[in-house]
């Protein structure tokens, strides 16, 4: 595993409990190593570049904006640092894995600080960090923990309802280096609060850049709280993007997630949701669209740990060229989780006879009064629909585009915020 376990002095080196947590992460990753096809949870997704290339941890003093210019001295008119967002948002930015100030002016009752600031100031952050992640089960989360430093602590206080989303923009400019960076986010939505959080991952500069972004988020949704969580993964086509979100939802809480993946050579978005108390619910939807030789993996694990909980999943993918789509979806119903509902559906559209989709739906049911279902299917574009559209004067390429858009539409319609929905639709 060249270049992944390195000696690096990290902030907070004198904090005993933090050093202990980092050491546990380092030991867990050293024991497990990189996941391979023999690892059940990774049997369809190969981390090709991670086992072959050397990687460099980025230097913080290389302060760059998204196009590679020095921060505050950008001369590129089309750079994202000069672009207006398509919807109002509180914007937070990361460049090459490092937070770039300033903080936006936030309403009362909303705390946002870097993770290291929070771990030195906030007992809330210290008491929650690392509690939702099983390091032995998730080796790349263990690797992330070994380098635990960069990331955000977001706390939405009791009863606060945000008037616009928090947008976390992540931009990579590798400058020809094989960069490797880890981000760790801790998000708390307290009882009765409501928020939207959007994450974007993109590159600027050379599209053939090789880099590895390893993201872990721990998310707490309180009683009767609501979190709508959106993500766009549009990394460079030779990058590797691996993300794990571990979510805990309390009584009456609602967690809504939508992930759109279209970039990276290997991209994996994994979410683990624990519905811990009655009336907790989760809706986890995703779309992926790719071509070339890419592999895009969507993995979900919904754990119904209490009675009267509900979950729904809808995942749709479009695969072209020699690319491969992966969906692994697990619904676990604990013995005491009676009168629970869990639904899961995956559909894929294959645009090439070389395209591949691997699907592994799972139901683990240990209660008898439940309503659960799962389904999966893949197919090609309807030739009759194509013929009909061609006969109406629509050229073949436009007809294909329209049919693909229509195929993905019912997944995108699950996004409640119309501005975000239209923006993501334009990106996909």
Where in this protein do the model-derived segments appear?
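Conserved beta-strand/loop scaffold segments within soluble protein domains that form the structured core
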Residues: 119-394, 408, 412-428
């Amino acid at each position: 595993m060249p270049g992944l376990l390195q000696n690096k002095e990290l902030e907070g080196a004198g904090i005993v409990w933090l050093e202990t947590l980092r050491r546990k992460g380092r030991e867990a990753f050293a024991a497990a190593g990189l996941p391979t096809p023999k690892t059940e949870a990774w049997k369809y997704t190969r981390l090709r570049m991670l086992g072959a290339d050397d990687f460099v941890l980025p230097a913080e003093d290389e302060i760059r904006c998204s196009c590679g210019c020095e921060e505050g001295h950008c001369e590129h008119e089309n750079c994202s640092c000069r672009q207006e967002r398509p919807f109002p948002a509180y914007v937070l930015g990361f460049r090459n894995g490092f937070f770039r100030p300033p903080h936006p002016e936030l309403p009362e009752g909303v705390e946002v600080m870097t993770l290291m600031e929070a771990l030195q100031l906030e007992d809330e952050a210290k008491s929650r960090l690392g509690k939702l992640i099983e390091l032995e089960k998730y080796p790349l989360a263990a690797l992330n923990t070994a380098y635990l430093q960069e990331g955000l602590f977001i706390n939405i206080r009791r009863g606060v309802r945000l008037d616009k989303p928090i947008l976390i923009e992540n931009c990579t400019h590798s400058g020809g280096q094989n960069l490797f960076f880890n981000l760790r986010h801790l998000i708390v939505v307290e009882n009765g609060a409501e928020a939207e959080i959007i994450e974007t991952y993109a590159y600027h500069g050379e599209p053939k850049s090789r880099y590895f972004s390893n993201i872990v988020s721990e998310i707490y949704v309180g009683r009767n709280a609501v979190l709508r969580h959106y993500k766009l993964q549009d990394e460079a086509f030779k990058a590797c993007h691996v993300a794990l979100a571990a979510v805990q939802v309390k009584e009456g809480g609602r967690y809504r997630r939508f992930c759109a993946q279209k970039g990276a050579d290997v991209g994996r978005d994994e979410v683990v949701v624990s519905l811990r108390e009655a009336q907790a619910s989760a809706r986890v939807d995703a779309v992926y669209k790719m071509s070339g030789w890419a592999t895009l993996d969507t993995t979900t694990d919904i754990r119904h740990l209490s009675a009267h909980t509900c979950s729904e999943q809808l995942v749709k993918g479009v695969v072209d060229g020699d690319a491969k789509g992966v969906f692994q979806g697990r619904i676990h119903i604990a013995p005491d989780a009676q009168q629970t509902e869990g639904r899961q559906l995956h559909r894929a559209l294959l645009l090439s006879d070389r395209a591949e989709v691997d699907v592994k739906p799972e139901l683990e049911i240990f209660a008898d009064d439940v309503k659960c279902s799962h389904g999966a299917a893949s197919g090609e574009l309807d030739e009759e629909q194509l013929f009909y559209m061609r006969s109406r004067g629509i050229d073949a390429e436009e007809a294909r585009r329209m049919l693909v858009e229509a195929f993905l539409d019912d997944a995108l319609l699950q996004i409640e915020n119309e501005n975000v929905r239209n923006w993501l639709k334009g990106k996909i």
